[in-house]
Amino acid sequence: MLNTLRWIIGHAAMMPFTFSYFALSVLLGRRKALSLVGKALSNVSVMSLGTIIPEMHNNDSFSDFKSRIIRNFSSYKLLYDVEIQSESNEFAEFKVLNCPFTSALRNFGTPELCRFACAGDFIIAKRNRSRWKFSRTHSHGTDGICCNHTYFSLDCKREESVDGKIERPEEKERY
């Protein structure tokens, strides 16, 4: 039952992007269609992830941010199969085992759109780089294994919290 609900939500949300991509590919070519639809999909991804990744105001501590993001990720647990991998005062690491949106894009035959659906967290991380750091080494949209999100305080000394991890080398197109 839960998998059916995830399937319906993912396919309903991604159908307009897939249809637009196929229609624009005929009219403008695949590259231009990918750029236009990808930008729109990234913007929607940022809006939807904005409900999960909380704002961190200047007077907030990282521990307040961390407790809110854990609460927010937990509320989406049924949709995404989210697990808290580890946490400390300086970081929170999540593992997302299921993404109905990238699954739908692959089912529709448009896996090239997956990276745009997965770009929202990196865009939000870039906007907040003066407040916290972000790292992700796996993504459902690229390697399909899982999605591992790690949010670090600026004071964190862990090796994975390098600012350069915000950029994904496979992203060559502008959003």
Label the model's feature ranges.
Residues M1-F91, P100-A117, R131-C147, S153-Y175:
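N-terminal accessory segment detector
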